[in-house]
Design a protein with these regions (language model features):
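Bacterial N-terminal signal peptides
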Residues: 8-20
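N-terminal secretory signal peptides that target proteins for export/translocation
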Residues: 1-4
Length: 298
């Protein structure tokens, strides 16, 4: 276990963000594909069960043991209360006792607020993607945390979580991303939603995944990963193999969803990679929109 060195945390005060309600999916989200995802879910569930069975103090005493099931290298269990205070953080014990509702990553994403949002909207667990340094490092990397709400024997509720750095992208991550974007468009209004989608603090881009919005004729309205494409009609666009993938997206029926496979570069790159995008077609005020996001194959 490397020694814990000084870690730089970024605290940013930003305007209130417009958060969509947690989405009701157009199709059932695909199950986790990778073993590391399943193991993380099991770890967090077991940790939450331990808090529920033995109480916070006893559970945290176990979570803090280096080399244990709960704390191995860069993987550790953390616990927050519902007021946003860290009550157990083995990797950064200096955070314990601090109210961290305004803790934000370098993109401005409110990390603890995002944890709370996942477990306060009728779901006992959820996923949050953000930038965070590994233990002993000051370099921020993409991290995906799985969080779960649990109740200790004394009746106090807590958020228990753990995360992985630069984990494999699951298809259900982008299904949730697209569904959140659709709910935002239908509840906040198109113009306000476009502003929120482009805001890096709101999480509509993480890792290589990003949201895009086309109108029913193929005009690119929002593209978080490739903003230079906005304002262009891409209906006739082909990938490197000659596939008219935008036409396939536009062919999705109103109210339906589909997965479209094609070749497309990752953000910041020019060489095409294999990509599969999940798209939904919706109608708002008489205008059709195709909302999508995708995963790149490794």
């Amino acid at each position: 276990m490397p020694c814990l060195r000084r870690t730089i945390l970024v605290l940013i005060l930003a305007p209130t963000l417009v958060w969509p309600p947690l989405a009701a999916t157009a199709e059932e989200a695909p199950p986790p594909l990778y073993d590391e995802t399943l193991l993380l879910v099991d770890l967090v569930r077991d940790a939450a069960d331990l808090v529920a069975a033995e109480g916070l103090d006893a559970a945290c005493a176990e979570f803090r043991q280096p080399g244990s099931h709960w704390f191995q290298d860069e993987i550790y269990v953390f616990v927050f209360d519902l007021e946003g205070s860290a009550v157990c953080h083995p990797a950064l014990p200096a955070l314990e006792g601090q109210e961290l509702l305004e803790l934000r990553d370098p993109l401005g994403k409110p990390i603890i607020q995002s944890f709370l949002r996942e477990v306060e909207s009728g779901s006992e667990s959820g996923w949050v993607h953000y930038l965070w340094p590994k233990p002993g490092s000051s370099t921020f990397r993409w991290k995906t945390a799985h969080v779960r709400r649990t109740t200790a024997p004394n009746g106090t509720d807590y958020i228990v979580g753990s995360g992985l750095y630069e984990m494999e992208m699951e298809r259900f991550f982008v299904v949730e991303q697209v569904d959140d974007a659709v709910d935002l468009l239908t509840t906040a209004g198109v113009e306000e939603a476009f502003y929120t989608l482009r805001d890096p603090a709101t999480g509509f881009r993480f890792y290589d995944a990003y949201v895009f919005v086309l109108d029913g004729d193929g005009l690119m309205l929002v593209n978080v990963g490739f903003p230079d494409l906005e304002g262009r009609n891409l209906a006739a666009l082909q990938d490197e193999s000659g596939k008219l993938f935008v036409q396939e997206m536009l062919a999705v029926e109103q109210g339906e969803s589909a997965w479209i496979d094609y070749l497309w570069p990752k953000p910041g790159e020019t060489r095409p990679s294999r990509k599969s995008s999940y798209v939904r077609r919706i109608e708002i005020d008489g205008r059709d929109y195709v909302v999508g996001a995708g995963v790149y194959f490794r």
